[in-house]
């Protein structure tokens, strides 16, 4: 049985087997609490902390985020505006243009891979830092093999007398760009 990529290195982070076990148990407990399927509620982008329009996903994106307790994840987000989603089909048809497909690709993202808690930083059931990866699948080729760092905050609230869980995911995108995504747990 091959070691889970997200778990490799725990012993290197600690000097004691007891500490290593505590780190693993804590990370495992957090992954278990985060496990589920989430629907995208909204996104926002900033550059150098100044709000900017989200040029990638548009003004009304849809998406799904899946975290498993065993340490895997999948994320998909796409724009919904017709200008960003030409009516192409899968498998592609001969009359569909590369330009139409490029537009779809430019305004969507999909990736999957291991999921881990960054144990080098404080983390608990409500906030910390996740590592999406190293990614094994991505529609953007340069993302394969790379880990995406994501800060998380879990918010539980009541809506219509039902407990609802939201996860806010923050990501640094380089060049002063930052994204914040809100996800609602649906399963």
Question: What would you call each of these model-derived segments?
Answer:
Residues 1-24:
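Fungal secretory targeting signals
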Residues 17-110, 117-187:
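Lipid interaction determinants
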